[in-house]
């Protein structure tokens, strides 16, 4: 990045017109990168963005840290370009003050003021001045380093506003367009840069405050390694995370093992989802509040032990916060998946109970059916047996007309009758044989008689 160079003309002509000239560059992009750091009006509401995202005003304890007058944290990384890291490189470029058309004034226009302050705040010199020399151990033992709540957002805003006010007052005091005016303005600019350098020299090395370097928090899918020794010290990640933020303000650096940092818009969407969705567990209801609290912009930061996530966040607390003072809820809520699972288990239990209840009924019906079938078959068999007895009774001459004859009598009489019948049969058979023999004899005798007659 080019620098805004200021050179004092040693002997300018008395009739030299005052004008302002800058190097050819795209100032719009540079101004957009540092626009949140510039406040034209000292009475501007610095917390308008927080109020729009439904955040609380700064806590009363925040004013305690204004006495330290620290610059915005986290500090910006030094430039990697060769020859740009030393403040001695800050040269000044010739520029002349342009007089007004009315001839009486000589003050800068609003555009010139914006460009000048943009150059002063966006230069590599200022970015480099945010980091002190790592070899300098003067401020390492400072008590501020050991305080986990050290902050500089409000102090930096007050410092910038005071410097701009003094800078504008110094330009307004010099009323006549003469060489002394240009000399005073240039000296004021030099003093402003010196003040920034002096204030920046009181900063500390970020490697001392952050023993575990952080990855780039601006990337949406940051997945840092779980091993802290795997991180390599990189100050460019801090610089890129500060400059690549959409609003230019220092974003909270979150080192988390599972979830990436959330912005205020994400927290608002999660809060809306929390209001719309009811079928969630208590832990899931608390999670969006915690994530929105960690992602909400605040003015202070704090560090945690190495085993816990290292979070830098400002001290504005979201209104949508879990009330830990409230009594614990007695109602037990289950997630949707767990409810479905419980319902399915309940249905399976009911089905099993129904099966257990219906199995005796089915067995009884089967037994009844079998018994009924057996009874039918047995009745048929008895009926057939009865008819057989009746038929047998009808065949016995002694029991032919006795309808009340018992079965035993029928069987006995039937047996006696059969034996008698069989005996008679044998007798008849023997008689038949005798008769046949007699017939044969008679036939033979008849044949003999016919032969004798012939």
From Swiss-Prot:
GO terms for cellular component: cytoplasm; nucleolus; nucleoplasm; nucleus. InterPro entries: bHLH_dom, HLH_DNA-bd_sf, Myc-LZ, Myc_transcription_factors, Tscrpt_reg_Myc, Tscrpt_reg_Myc_N. Its main location: nucleus. Residues 281-293 have a biased composition (Basic and acidic residues). A motif (9aaTAD) lies at residues 115-123. The modification Phosphoserine is found at residues 21, 77, 86, 96, 166, 174, 176, 308, 329, 344, 359, 362-363. Phosphorylated by PRKDC. Phosphorylation at Ser-344 by PIM2 leads to the stabilization of MYC. Phosphorylation at Ser-77 by CDK2 prevents Ras-induced senescence. Phosphorylated at Ser-77 by DYRK2; this primes the protein for subsequent phosphorylation by GSK3B at Thr-73. Phosphorylation at Thr-73 and Ser-77 by GSK3 is required for ubiquitination and degradation by the proteasome. Dephosphorylation at multiple sites by the PNUTS-PP1 complex promotes MYC stability by preventing ubiquitination by the SCF(FBXW7) complex. It is found in: Nucleus, Nucleoplasm; Nucleus, Nucleolus; Nucleus; Cytoplasm. Keywords: Acetylation, Activator, Chromosome, Cytoplasm, DNA-binding, Glycoprotein, Isopeptide bond, Nucleus, Phosphoprotein, Proto-oncogene, Transcription, Transcription regulation, Ubl conjugation. Residues 369-421 form the bHLH domain. The keyword Cell division does not apply. The keyword Transmembrane does not apply. Residues 350-362 have a biased composition (Polar residues). One of its GO terms (molecular function) is DNA-binding transcription factor activity, RNA polymerase II-specific. There is a cross-link at residues 67, 158, 163, 313 (Glycyl lysine isopeptide (Lys-Gly) (interchain with G-Cter in SUMO2)). Glycans are attached at residue 73. Residues 266-278 have a biased composition (Acidic residues). The modification Phosphothreonine is found at residues 23, 73, 330. It comes from the Eukaryota. It holds the Pfam family Myc-LZ. The 9aaTAD motif is a transactivation domain present in a large number of yeast and animal transcription factors. Alternative translation initiation from an upstream, in-frame non-ATG (CTG) codon or a downstream ATG start site results in the production of 2 isoforms with distinct N-termini, shown in this entry as isoform 2 and isoform 1, respectively. Efficient DNA binding requires dimerization with another bHLH protein. Binds DNA as a heterodimer with MAX. Interacts with TAF1C and SPAG9. Interacts with PARP10. Interacts with KDM5A and KDM5B. Interacts (when phosphorylated at Thr-73 and Ser-77) with FBXW7. Interacts with PIM2. Interacts with RIOX1. The heterodimer MYC:MAX interacts with ABI1; the interaction may enhance MYC:MAX transcriptional activity. Interacts with TRIM6. Interacts with NPM1; the binary complex is recruited to the promoter of MYC target genes and enhances their transcription. This is Myc proto-oncogene protein. The gene is MYC.
